């Protein structure tokens, strides 16, 4: 049997909401090291990964690795009630799927819901193995605003980097938009192993960057014409990871 408690029901809700931008059904994989879910869109343009490492889980019990296929909206029904930062969420395996309990540690109030789920083996999707020659970190709201502005002008964005600047630009029908990101303006960190350039869909980028607003320390990595990696951590240890395929 499986039982896991996560310290922030509110963050759990935010992470699941990020997954819901891509799919409404996921396989929650329970392993010795973590709880995670991976999903690849049919067109193979976008992969999203939800992950909570074992060290951020309380009272984690697992007899054997297991996947449980569930509908995210079923989970959100109860997690949406978790307005307090002190609310925890507990997942327990049942014969039919999962029992989900949200408990407010301050008030002692508790809500339960039973979710039907199909038990499966651990999914075998793997992340791209690429060398990200450029990485930078910034507030998620910064990326959300940039994506919104890009979408007003074009359909694809060129992102490039040199020693001290990351540039995101688009041009269409005589209109141009360009954003220059530098260390401390507004980047919190910037590492450029070599000058790099790639082109991505603005529509996909906009959907992903909407989710980044849940974090103040989003890390973006890319290289020459390779998938972009976007890491969105939460204060409670859970995270979302997105991979976006380039336009070639």
Curated annotation (Swiss-Prot):
GO function term, MF aspect, one: DNA binding
Top-level taxon in the UniProt lineage: Archaea
InterPro entries: DNA_clamp_sf, Pr_cel_nuc_antig, Pr_cel_nuc_antig_C, Pr_cel_nuc_antig_N
GO biological process terms held by the UniProt record: leading strand elongation; regulation of DNA replication
Coiled coil: none
Gene3D superfamilies: 3.70.10.10
UniProt xrefs under Pfam families: PCNA_C, PCNA_N
Keywords: DNA replication, DNA-binding
Protein family according to the UniProt entry: Belongs to the PCNA family.
Complex and partners: The subunits circularize to form a toroid; DNA passes through its center. Replication factor C (RFC) is required to load the toroid on the DNA. Forms a dimeric complex with PCNA3 and trimeric complexes PCNA123 and PCNA323; does not form homotrimers. Crystal structures show a heterotetramer of 2 PCNA2 and 2 PCNA3, which would be large enough to clamp a Holliday junction.
Biological function: Sliding clamp subunit that acts as a moving platform for DNA processing. Responsible for tethering the catalytic subunit of DNA polymerase and other proteins to DNA during high-speed replication. Both trimeric complexes inhibit DNA ligase and both 3'-5' and 5'-3' activity of Hel308 (Hjm) helicase, but stimulate Hjc, the Holliday junction cleavage enzyme.
Protein's name according to its UniProt entry: DNA polymerase sliding clamp 2
Taxonomic source organism: Sulfurisphaera tokodaii (strain DSM 16993 / JCM 10545 / NBRC 100140 / 7)
Classification of source organism: Archaea, Thermoproteota, Thermoprotei, Sulfolobales, Sulfolobaceae
Gene: pcn2
